[in-house]
Amino acid sequence: MRAWCDYVRKNQKQRFQTYRQVCGCPYTSVGGELATQDKKVRLETQALIDRFVKYLSGAIADAITDGSAAPGDPQTKAKLVHAFVVGLLLRAKIYNDLKILSHLETGLFALIGAKIPKGPAK
């Protein structure tokens, strides 16, 4: 999970260096704007979100199984994590401030009931 947080920050930083703007999540930006206007876009955005939540759910289930995350429903936790991350990316985009993404790990690990591991991300 820490490596994924690092990936998100690195990806946003690279885009910022190119466009001089925090870009946020392209799927939810486009999906959020067009979902009420275009059913195909809405359905595709839903599919992307569902795929990502499924990935997160599996990672969270593994963390629960190995005792590094608190017991609970991995699917629910994954949906909460997704909503948190999308919200943080949107906030960073609105404020054009990458520092907002420094809270990614703290919030994510709190939502799944886990401690942030010491040392570098794996």
Q: Language model features by range: what are they?
A:
Residues 18-40:
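Amphipathic alpha-helical segments used for helix-helix packing
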